[in-house]
Every structure is written in C-alpha cells, then in structure tokens.
From Swiss-Prot:
This is Large ribosomal subunit protein bL28. SUPFAM superfamilies: L28p-like. The keyword Ribosomal protein applies. It comes from Bacillus velezensis (strain DSM 23117 / BGSC 10A6 / LMG 26770 / FZB42) (Bacillus amyloliquefaciens subsp. plantarum). GO terms for biological process: translation. The gene is rpmB. GO terms for molecular function: structural constituent of ribosome. The keyword NADP does not apply.
Length: 62
C-alpha cells in the first residue's frame, strides 16, 4: 500500500539535499501520515490520513 493520504492525496515528494559546496544528493520528504480508523461507506476501515486533514476536521475518527 502506498504511503498516501486517503483524504487529501498527499504523498512522498522527492528533491535534493544540498551540501555547503552545493553538491546534490537525492532525498524524499514524507507526508505526516497517521493510521486511523474512519467510516468508509458506513463501515470502519483503517487508512492513512495526513495530520493536516485530521486537524482541519476533514475526517472523523471512529
């Protein structure tokens, strides 16, 4: 299962680390995902939801 927010679609982003000499090395930024139980089609289901979606009230825990 991909590490992706069930509600907002947020997922891992890629980019570069830059050293003092401006050398680039690949790195990733992960979304702040929490595994929570929510109602999906009237049934409880465990899904990954971003912390931002939880804080803004876009999803309600069961």
């Amino acid at each position: 299962m991909a590490r992706k927010c069930f509600i907002t679609g947020k997922k891992t982003k890629a980019g570069n680390n830059r050293s003092h000499a401006m050398n680039a090395s690949k790195r990733t930024w992960g979304a702040n995902l929490q595994k929570v139980r929510i109602l999906v089609d009237g049934k409880p289901k465990k899904v990954y939801v971003s912390a931002r979606a939880l804080k803004s009230g876009k999803v309600e825990r069961v």
